[in-house]
Amino acid sequence: MTEAIYAIPDIHGQDALLEDALHRIARDGGKDARIIFLGDLVDRGPNSRAVIDRLMMGQAQGRPWTVLRGNHDQMFVDFLDSGVIQSPHIRSGLSWLHHRLGGAATLASYGLDVSGDVTEWEAARRAVP
């Protein structure tokens, strides 16, 4: 018998939907089911921090989870690394902090209010593990 592999795409900070998906997978494939998270973990949704924390906890517990980085995750990393809010890959010219991209929502989940600017960059670096 072959092992089932589950894939979860584009969570976008939707922690309640992530928990629902994890419960469904556990019912179908067991608590140690292999899951691949296909990136775009953060932005737009209400609780990117809870999504990141949940995935880190699962991996720390030894769950067979593979987490890939999506373009929204990369924009988050770029901001944390150097305060960059403009990506050359975004054709619209919108900054990562624009509500359509969701960076401000991600930072809000860490208790930060950037109000459209990057003055909270150092605070963000301290707040995110």
Residue positions per predicted region:
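N-terminal active-site segment of His-dependent metallophosphoesterases
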Residues: 1-54
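Active-site neighborhood of divalent metal-dependent phosphoester bond hydrolases
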Residues: 45, 49-52, 56-129
